[in-house]
């Protein structure tokens, strides 16, 4: 960036998408400040790296900033945004700052309604194993790094591309991965056709020497293939895919499959994340790695050492014979995939699910899809909707969803609003051999951590 820009301020710096960019900028030598409503492990890490963190939003926080970066969750009436405009300080979306970082490297952008974080993490892990030393900006904590960002010395930047507000169109990657296209963020998009149009525009932004990596198993991607004008390769379980998986085996937290490229057997891949959906994510990572001439043996080694991603079927702990697992899944497609993975890998275990719906708008738009998403849950408990800054919508409640799921035929469904009562209910319900799965993009993970403490205390008493 032009040398006159020295101090960069982030409004909502504790968010997973914002913090990664902030960390890379700190490591590049920029002065970084940011504000958030409360402290967290993320803000503590940024402070340890030299960032200045303010708690609460106030006009004076931007006094010395040369540019202010905001996420889509920050509104125009935020006092820091208002003050920045008064001071004629540029206010830009996080995607524009990510685009600026990507402009200095060869960008690998991973987009898609689902699977972005896991796929980005797999790509980053394999490229690192291959000696490419990429800069990494991920929307989740890569367990092997203990963070979601890293400044590499190589020529590539691997980043997650967020389609939620269309701002991923600001990016200009050399390699664009699209894991799937599904109906989501219908508070921003008019419907699936506009979503498909936007992804086509994203894919066609790559340069003539670039590559698009596209999942052929996804019907919406298959629909738009005739509109793709740039070089692409495909992946999936389909026999027509360029990169294909066969002999998929799911056992516990382990997944293995045999990878093929254009009919040629490459070899077996094994990694420690459950689920057939993660086989697809792995195929995308293989396609990217082979485009960069990383030997398949190195790719195998990268997957063998892949430690997974925070909040993606993450084992939090075990007590009294009960495993506590947390997952970020909050869309019906993600929920079905996660519960299916749990059932496939742990067929003998009872699955007790605590789901926290995320956003009133998503719950309303995808209500009937949510109703059908929990078939593989043996016990289902819903807690109140996490608003993520949205105002309530009349009639759209977790209680209404629980009632509808019950009428759909799910037998053991409960709605509990109060967290203490929810944990007390879980203490009565859980038994040795169960898997307790907390599910959602809000703060439902706290239920799992509380239950681990209670289960351990019960064991010691």
Curated annotation (Swiss-Prot):
Molecular functions (GO terms): ATP binding; UDP-N-acetylmuramate-L-alanine ligase activity
One example of a Gene Ontology biological process annotation: cell wall organization
Known pathway: Cell wall biogenesis; peptidoglycan biosynthesis
Signal peptide, first to last residue: none
Species for this entry: Citrifermentans bemidjiense (strain ATCC BAA-1014 / DSM 16622 / JCM 12645 / Bem)
HAMAP family per UniProt: MurC
Organism domain of life: Bacteria
Described purpose of this protein according to its UniProt entry: Cell wall formation.
Keywords: ATP-binding, Cell cycle, Cell division, Cell shape, Cell wall biogenesis/degradation, Cytoplasm, Ligase, Nucleotide-binding, Peptidoglycan synthesis
Taxon lineage: Bacteria, Pseudomonadati, Thermodesulfobacteriota, Desulfuromonadia, Geobacterales
Main location per the UniProt record: cytoplasm
Residues reported to bind ATP: 112-118
Subcellular localization, as worded in the UniProt entry: Cytoplasm
EC number: 6.3.2.8
GO cellular component term of the entry, any: cytoplasm
Name by which UniProt lists this protein: UDP-N-acetylmuramate--L-alanine ligase
Class of the enzyme per the UniProt entry, highest EC level: ligase
Known catalytic reactions: UDP-N-acetyl-alpha-D-muramate + L-alanine + ATP = UDP-N-acetyl-alpha-D-muramoyl-L-alanine + ADP + phosphate + H(+)
Pfam families attached to this UniProt entry: Mur_ligase, Mur_ligase_C, Mur_ligase_M
Family membership: Belongs to the MurCDEF family.
């Amino acid at each position: 960036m032009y040398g006159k820009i020295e101090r960069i301020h982030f409004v909502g710096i504790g968010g997973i998408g914002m913090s990664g960019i902030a960390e890379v900028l700190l490591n590049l030598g920029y002065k970084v400040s940011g504000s958030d409503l409360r402290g967290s492990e993320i803000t503590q890490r940024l402070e340890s790296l030299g960032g200045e963190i303010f708690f609460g939003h106030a006009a004076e926080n931007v006094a010395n900033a040369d540019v202010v970066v905001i996420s889509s969750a920050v509104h125009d009436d935020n006092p820091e945004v208002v003050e920045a405009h008064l001071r004629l300080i540029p206010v830009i979306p996080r995607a524009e700052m990510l685009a600026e970082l990507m402009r200095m490297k060869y960008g690998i952008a991973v987009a898609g309604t689902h699977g972005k974080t896991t796929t980005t993490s797999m790509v980053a892990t394999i490229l690192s194993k291959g000696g490419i030393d990429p800069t990494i900006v991920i929307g989740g904590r890569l367990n092997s790094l203990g963070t979601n960002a890293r400044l590499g010395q190589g020529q590539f930047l691997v980043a997650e591309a967020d389609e939620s507000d269309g701002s991923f169109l600001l990016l200009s990657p050399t390699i664009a991965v699209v894991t799937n296209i599904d109906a989501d963020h219908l508070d921003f998009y008019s419907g699936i056709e506009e979503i498909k149009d936007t992804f086509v525009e994203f894919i066609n932004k790559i340069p003539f020497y670039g590559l698009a990596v596209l999942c052929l198993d996804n019907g919406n991607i298959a629909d738009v293939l005739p509109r793709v004008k740039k070089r692409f390769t495909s992946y999936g379980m389909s026999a027509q895919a360029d990169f294909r998986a066969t002999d998929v085996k799911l056992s516990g937290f382990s997944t293995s499959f045999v990878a093929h490229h254009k009919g040629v057997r490459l070899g077996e891949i094994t990694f420690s994340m459950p689920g057939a959906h993660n086989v697809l994510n792995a195929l995308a990572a293989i396609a990217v790695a082979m485009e960069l001439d990383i030997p398949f043996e190195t790719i195998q080694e990268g997957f063998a050492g892949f430690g997974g991603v925070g909040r993606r079927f993450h084992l939090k702990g075990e007590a009294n014979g009960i495993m506590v697992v947390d997952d970020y899944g909050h869309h019906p497609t993600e929920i079905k995939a996660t519960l299916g993975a749990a059932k496939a890998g742990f067929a003998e275990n009872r699955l007790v699910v605590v789901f926290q719906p995320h956003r009133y708008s998503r719950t309303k738009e995808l209500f009937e899809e949510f109703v059908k998403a929990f078939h593989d849950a043996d016990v289902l408990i819903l807690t109140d909707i996490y608003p993520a800054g949205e105002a309530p919508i009349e009639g759209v409640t977790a209680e209404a969803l629980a009632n509808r799921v019950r009428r759909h035929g799910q037998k053991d469904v409960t709605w509990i609003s109060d967290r203490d009562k929810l944990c007390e209910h879980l203490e009565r319900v859980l038994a040795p051999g169960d898997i307790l799965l907390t599910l959602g993009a809000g703060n439902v993970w706290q239920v799992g951590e509380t239950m681990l403490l209670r289960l351990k205390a019960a064991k010691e008493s």
